[in-house]
C-alpha cells in the first residue's frame, strides 16, 4: 500500500491536520503536514492512543467452570450399585495481547536466526573436517602408490636413491602439511565465531525466553485449548465442544494425547471397563464414529464481497408499479427509493403504487436505464385482430360548430336542419354535444354542435379532436369573445382547418370588418386579406349565406380528400353518454371507419357489451351505421366516458377481460396520482384552524355536463372554503345517494334529472338539502353563495363618538364622575368605551352611568355636556378623552 501524507490521513479520519501532528508528537514521532506516514507509524500511533484512552483495561482472561453429574453402575457380587459421579471441568479463555504476540514473533525470529547461525557454524566445521580427512586420505593413497611404484622399480632395476631426490620429497611433504594445518585453523576460527554469536544472542534473550517458557507452561496448565485467537472462532469452538459433550464424546482437537487410563481394581473391574470398550469401538469406526468428526469451523470468512460500484441494470416498468416491486427490479432496498422520492419532493410508502412516469423519473435519477413495457398483450392482440386488405373510400366530412355563447351556433344548425333545436335546450343555450347528419344536394355533412359556455371546455376539446373541419361562429354585433379565442386554440391544437361564419349579419349594428380585424389578432386571417381562412357572412334568422357556407364546407372536404374504410369492423369515438332509466347506459358514438351493426361486440373504454339497439339522432331505430354517422347505441355494461374510443371486437369474453384489466389499471393509476403527497403541500396545509368544506353529491343527465359542472365547482375552491364532491354520476338521484348525503351532511344537486320515490322519502325524513337545476349559470351562482356563507366573518370597529373630560367630580355611589363635552359623534350608554390619555389607550371597558343634568339618558349628541361614570375605573383626569365604539360584522363573498 502506498504511503499517505499526514494531511490526507487527517481528512480520512475526520480530524484536523494540526491535531494529528500533535498526536504523532505525543507518540514520539516527529511529523509535519507534508510528511508521509508508513503503516508501522500508523500502528505505533494507534497503540499509543489505545493506551492513552484506556484501551487495555478490558479483561484479558476469563475462567468458566462446568459441572456434570452422571450415574455409574458398579457390580458388587450378585447385586449392582449405582454410584453418582461428578465431573468438574475448568476452562480459561485468554485474550492474547497484540504486543505480546509481536514480542513472541520477534523472539521466534531471533531464535531462528541463532539456530541458523549455529547450523551454519556446525556445517562449516563439519566441512572443514571432511576436507581435512579427504586430503589426508588422498595423501595416504598417493604415498602408497609411490611406494608401490618404487618397490616395483627397485625389483625391476634396483637403483640407489640419491640424496637429492630424498631431499625434494621431504620438502613436498612439509608444504602439504603446512596447507593442511592452515585449513584446519581457518575452520576452527569460523566455528568459534559462530559459537560466540550464538552465545551473545543467548545471553541477550535468555531472560525473555525463560519468561515466555514460564507463561507457556502456565497457559497449558490453565487448559486453554483454543486453536485460534479470533473471538468468533473461539465461540464456534466452544459451541462445538458443548454439542460434543451432549453426545457423550470428546471433540477431536489439536490437544496432547490422553494419558493411559489407570487399571481398574477390585470387583468392579469388568463393569468399569464398559466406557473404555465404547471408546475403543468408536475409535475402530463403530456406530458413533461418525459423531467424532471435527465440527470446529476451519474459517469464519464469508463468501460475499461488497461491490466496488453500483450495479446499473435495465428496469422494465409497466403502467403502474409498487415501490417494493421497483426496488426489487433495481436490486436495492425499498428504503433507498423512499429516500430518493423524498429528495424529489414526494412521500411514499413501501406498498404505494407509482404511475409509469413517476417510476421512470425515480429509476433514471438513480442511474438505471428504463424500458417502458405494455403489460396487457391481450388488449394489443384484441385490437390488432381487425379486417385487413379493405380499400378506403370517400366519406362525409365531420364538422364541429364552435363559438361564444349566444352567438347563434345552434340556431345556425337549426336552420340547416330545418328543425327547432335551440328551443329544446334549457335557457336557450346548448349544454350537450349534439351530433346530426344532413343530406345536401352535393353530399352528406355531419355536424357536431358544442356548448359555448366556459364550463364546457373539455366538451369543445373533444369536438375538435373528432372533427375534420371547424366552423367558428362569431356574432357580427358582438365580435371576438373569450370562448371564441378558446375555440381558435382548440382548432389550432388539433390541426383542423377553420371556416369563420360571421352570424347575425342582418342586424343593423353588425360590423363584419371589426370581426375580421379582431380575429386577425389571433392568427385567423381572411382570404380577402391574404390569409387561408374562409369567411362567410350568414344569418341564422333569414337564411342568408347558408348555401355558401355548405358549399365552402364541401369544397374544404374535397381538398382534404377524406377517406375511410366503409366495410369491415367499425371504430369510432364516444361524443356523449348518459344513463337512461328505461334503456340503461346510452352512448352517442361517431363512427369513423367501418360499419357498426346491431349485435356487434363493442369495447368502449372501461366498458364493453353487445349492441342491442341503435338509433339515429332523430330517435329512429337503425340496423347499421357507416363512417361519419352519429348513432346512439344501447347494451354497454356501464356509462363510458366521453372521448373514449369505441372499437368492435370479435370475442365478447376477451372484450370483458380487456375491460376489466383497464378498470383495474385505471383504478391503480388514479390511486397513484391521488396518493402523491408532496412535501410543499404538507407544509402548506399546516395552518391554524380548519378549512371549511362544502360537501356536494352531483348527478347530471349526461357525462359531458357532469364533467363540466364538476370542473367549474372545483375551481370555486379557495384557501378558506373547499368544494368536496363526494359522489358524482350520471342518472337520477337514488336512495343510496340520499343516504350518503344525510350521513356526510352534503347538499344534493341534480342537473336535468330528478330523484326517485325512495330517494324522496329519505330526503324528507333526513331533511337533506336538494336542489334541481337546468341552467349551469344558476347552479354555479348558488353554490358560490353557499360557499360565501361558510367564509369566516370579518369584524370592524366603528367609532361612534368622542367626549373630552373637562372636570372630575366625586360620587359616593359611583366614584369618579367625568364632566365631559361631546366633541364628535354620539355617546351611547350601551356601547363599549376606551379612555385615552394623550392619544394612548389606558383603559377599555364600559359605561356605568350617563347623565345629562340629573337625568339618565341613553345617548348624548355632539356639542352637549354630560356626566360619564366609567365602570370599575376611578383614575379619570381632566384632559382625558372617552371614545365610544361598536363592532360590526362585514359579510364576505368569494369575489373578494
UniProtKB/Swiss-Prot annotation:
Stretches with biased composition (Polar residues): 60-79
Domain tr-type G stretches: 394-563
Ranges for region G1: 403-410
Annotated keywords: Cytoplasm, GTP-binding, Initiation factor, Nucleotide-binding, Protein biosynthesis
InterPro entries, sorted: DNA-bd_dom_put_sf (IPR009061), EF-G-like_DII (IPR053905), EFTu-like_2 (IPR004161), IF2_assoc_dom_bac (IPR013575), IF2_II (IPR044145), IF2_N (IPR006847), P-loop_NTPase (IPR027417), Small_GTP-bd (IPR005225)
Cytoplasm found in the keyword field: yes
Biased composition (Low complexity): 254-266, 283-294
Region (G5) residue spans: 539-541
Region (G3): 449-452
Annotated region (G4), positions in chain: 503-506
A Pfam family of this chain: IF2_N
Chain intervals for the UniProt region annotation (G2): 428-432
GO molecular function, one term: GTPase activity
Entry function: One of the essential components for the initiation of protein synthesis. Protects formylmethionyl-tRNA from spontaneous hydrolysis and promotes its binding to the 30S ribosomal subunits. Also involved in the hydrolysis of GTP during the formation of the 70S ribosomal complex.
Family: Belongs to the TRAFAC class translation factor GTPase superfamily. Classic translation factor GTPase family. IF-2 subfamily.
PANTHER family in UniProt: TR-TYPE G DOMAIN-CONTAINING PROTEIN (PTHR43381:SF5), TRANSLATION INITIATION FACTOR IF-2-RELATED (PTHR43381)
NCBIfam families: IF-2, small_GTP
Protein name stated in the entry: Translation initiation factor IF-2
Amino acid at each position: 500500500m502506498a504511503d499517505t501524507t499526514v494531511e490526507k490521513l487527517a481528512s480520512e479520519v475526520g480530524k484536523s491536520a494540526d491535531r494529528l501532528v500533535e498526536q504523532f508528537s505525543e507518540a514520539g514521532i516527529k511529523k509535519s503536514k507534508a510528511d508521509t506516514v508508513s503503516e508501522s507509524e500508523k500502528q505505533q500511533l494507534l497503540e499509543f492512543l489505545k493506551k492513552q484512552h484506556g484501551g487495555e483495561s478490558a479483561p484479558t482472561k476469563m475462567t468458566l467452570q462446568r459441572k456434570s453429574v452422571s450415574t455409574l453402575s458398579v457390580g458388587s457380587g450378585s447385586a449392582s450399585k449405582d454410584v453418582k459421579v461428578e465431573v468438574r471441568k475448568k476452562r480459561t479463555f485468554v485474550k492474547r495481547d497484540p504486543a505480546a504476540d509481536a514480542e513472541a514473533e520477534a523472539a521466534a525470529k531471533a531464535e531462528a536466526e541463532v539456530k541458523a547461525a549455529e547450523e551454519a557454524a556446525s556445517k562449516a566445521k563439519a566441512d572443514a573436517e571432511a576436507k581435512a580427512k579427504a586430503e589426508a586420505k588422498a595423501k595416504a593413497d598417493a604415498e602408497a602408490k609411490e611406494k608401490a611404484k618404487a618397490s616395483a622399480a627397485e625389483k625391476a632395476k634396483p637403483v640407489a636413491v640419491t640424496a637429492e631426490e630424498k631431499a625434494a620429497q621431504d620438502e613436498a611433504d612439509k608444504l602439504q602439511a603446512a596447507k593442511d594445518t592452515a585449513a584446519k585453523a581457518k575452520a576452527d576460527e569460523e566455528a568459534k565465531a559462530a559459537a560466540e554469536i550464538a552465545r551473545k544472542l543467548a545471553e541477550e534473550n535468555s531472560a525473555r525466553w525463560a519468561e515466555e517458557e514460564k507463561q507457556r507452561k502456565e497457559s497449558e496448565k490453565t487448559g486453554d485449548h483454543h486453536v485460534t485467537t479470533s473471538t468468533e472462532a473461539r465461540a464456534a469452538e466452544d459451541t462445538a465442544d458443548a454439542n460434543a459433550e451432549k453426545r457423550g464424546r470428546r471433540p477431536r482437537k489439536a490437544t496432547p494425547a490422553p494419558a493411559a487410563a489407570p487399571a481398574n481394581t477390585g470387583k468392579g473391574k469388568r463393569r468399569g471397563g464398559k466406557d473404555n470398550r465404547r471408546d475403543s469401538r468408536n475409535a475402530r469406526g463403530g456406530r458413533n464414529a461418525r459423531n467424532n468428526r471435527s465440527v470446529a469451523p476451519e474459517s469464519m470468512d464469508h463468501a460475499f464481497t461488497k461491490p466496488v460500484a453500483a450495479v446499473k441494470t435495465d428496469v422494465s416498468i409497466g403502467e403502474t408499479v409498487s415501490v417494493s416491486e421497483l426496488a426489487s427490479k433495481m436490486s436495492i432496498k425499498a428504503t433507498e427509493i423512499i429516500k430518493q422520492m423524498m429528495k424529489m419532493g414526494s412521500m411514499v410508502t413501501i406498498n404505494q403504487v407509482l404511475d409509469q412516469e413517476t417510476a421512470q423519473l425515480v429509476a433514471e435519477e438513480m442511474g438505471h436505464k428504463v424500458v417502458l413495457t405494455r403489460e396487457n398483450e391481450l388488449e394489443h392482440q384484441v385490437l390488432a385482430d381487425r379486417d385487413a386488405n379493405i380499400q378506403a373510400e370517400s366519406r362525409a366530412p365531420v364538422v364541429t360548430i364552435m363559438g361564444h355563447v349566444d352567438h347563434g351556433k345552434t340556431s345556425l344548425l337549426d336552420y340547416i336542419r330545418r328543425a327547432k333545436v335551440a328551443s329544446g335546450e334549457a335557457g336557450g343555450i346548448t349544454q350537450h354535444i349534439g351530433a346530426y347528419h344532413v343530406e345536401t344536394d352535393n353530399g352528406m355533412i355531419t355536424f357536431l354542435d358544442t356548448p359555448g359556455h366556459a364550463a364546457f371546455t373539455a366538451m369543445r376539446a373533444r369536438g375538435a379532436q373528432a372533427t375534420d373541419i371547424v366552423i367558428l361562429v362569431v356574432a357580427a354585433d358582438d365580435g371576438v369573445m373569450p370562448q371564441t379565442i378558446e375555440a381558435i386554440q382548440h382548432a389550432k391544437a388539433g390541426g383542423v382547418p377553420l371556416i369563420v361564419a360571421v352570424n347575425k349579419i342582418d342586424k343593423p349594428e353588425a360590423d363584419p370588418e371589426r370581426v375580421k380585424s379582431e380575429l386577425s389578432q389571433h392568427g385567423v386571417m381572411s382570404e380577402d386579406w391574404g390569409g387561408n381562412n374562409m369567411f362567410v357572412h350568414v344569418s341564422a334568422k333569414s337564411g342568408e349565406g347558408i348555401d355558401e357556407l355548405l358549399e365552402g364546407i364541401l369544397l374544404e372536404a374535397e381538398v382534404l380528400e377524406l377517406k375511410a374504410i366503409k366495410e369491415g369492423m367499425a371504430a369510432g369515438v364516444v361524443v356523449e353518454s348518459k344513463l337512461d332509466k328505461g334503456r340503461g347506459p346510452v352512448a352517442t358514438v361517431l363512427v369513423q371507419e367501418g360499419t357498426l351493426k346491431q349485435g356487434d361486440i363493442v369495447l368502449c373504454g372501461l366498458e364493453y357489451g353487445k349492441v342491442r339497439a341503435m338509433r339515429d339522432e332523430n330517435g329512429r331505430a337503425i340496423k347499421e351505421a357507416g363512417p361519419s354517422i352519429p348513432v346512439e347505441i344501447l347494451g354497454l355494461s356501464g356509462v363510458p366516458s366521453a372521448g373514449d374510443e369505441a372499437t368492435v371486437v370479435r370475442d365478447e369474453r376477451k372484450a370483458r377481460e380487456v375491460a376489466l384489466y383497464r378498470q383495474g389499471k385505471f383504478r391503480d393509476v388514479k390511486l397513484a396520482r391521488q396518493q402523491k403527497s408532496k412535501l410543499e403541500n404538507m407544509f402548506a396545509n399546516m395552518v391554524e384552524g380548519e378549512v371549511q368544506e362544502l360537501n356536494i353529491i352531483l348527478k347530471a343527465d349526461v357525462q359531458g355536463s357532469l364533467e363540466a359542472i364538476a370542473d367549474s365547482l372545483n375551481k370555486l375552491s379557495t384557501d378558506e372554503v373547499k368544494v368536496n364532491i363526494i359522489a358524482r354520476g350520471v342518472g337520477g338521484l337514488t336512495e343510496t345517494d340520499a343516504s350518503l348525503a344525510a350521513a356526510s351532511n352534503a347538499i344534493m344537486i341534480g342537473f336535468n334529472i330528478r330523484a326517485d320515490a325512495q330517494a324522496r322519502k329519505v330526503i324528507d325524513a333526513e331533511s337533506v338539502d336538494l336542489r334541481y337545476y337546468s341552467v349551469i349559470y344558476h347552479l354555479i351562482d348558488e353554490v358560490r353563495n353557499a360557499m360565501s356563507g361558510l367564509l369566516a366573518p370579518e369584524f370592524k370597529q366603528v367609532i361612534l363618538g368622542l367626549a373630552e373630560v373637562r372636570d372630575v367630580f366625586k360620587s359616593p355611589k359611583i366614584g369618579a364622575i367625568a364632566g365631559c363635552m361631546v366633541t364628535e359623534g354620539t355617546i351611547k350608554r350601551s356601547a363599549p368605551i376606551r379612555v385615552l390619555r394623550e392619544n394612548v389607550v389606558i383603559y377599555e371597558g364600559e359605561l356605568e352611568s350617563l347623565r345629562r343634568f340629573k337625568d339618565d339618558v341613553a345617548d348624548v349628541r355632539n356639542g352637549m355636556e354630560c356626566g360619564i361614570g366609567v365602570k370599575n375605573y376611578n383614575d379619570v383626569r381632566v384632559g382625558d378623552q372617552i371614545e365610544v365604539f361598536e363592532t360590526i360584522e362585514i359579510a364576505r363573498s368569494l369575489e373578494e
